[in-house]
Amino acid sequence: MPSHPLTLVTVLGSATPPGRLRTAVAGATERAAAQDGVEARLIDLAEHRIAPADGRPPEQLGDDTGAVIDALAAADAVVLATPVYRGSMTGVLKNLLDHVPVEALEGTPVGIVAMGATDHHFLGAERHLRDVLAFFGALTAPVAVYLSSRDFADGRPSEAAAAQLDELAATLLGLAR
């Protein structure tokens, strides 16, 4: 067991104003951070300026790209959360991942959370993210969380949805130990 606190970083890959997905993953991140021996933080890409991936190293970009990459590289476990856009992950999340060096996620436990308006999109983002995470050599959690409109009431996640998110975090932290 590591002598330092385990670090869980959740990346919310949405460029739109905060909504249900942010509420759900922020709550799960806060609950993970409340555990002994766990530090957790949410990186909302809507709040960070990430340059277009054009081959330049992060230190030449003059924005938030390098700091976000450093946070991912230092994490013991990562959650990637994305709304489903056009049957896949968002462009802002893919753009960030295009900046990340392979060694930053190699061997790191990574979980996938996707959200779509209906259940018809449940595999799109997950399938594409699994392909990208395989490229990195990440230790991808075997079960992803998919949320849709039915998982929320009054903008808040249902108990079942919150439990799925908490179980994903527990799985990732267990793998990181």
Summary of predicted features, one role per range:
Residues 61-64, 125, 157:
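Residue-level signature of the cytosolic catalytic core of signaling kinases
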Residues 95-102, 130-134:
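A glycine- and small-aliphatic-rich helix-loop capping segment at beta-alpha/alpha-beta transitions
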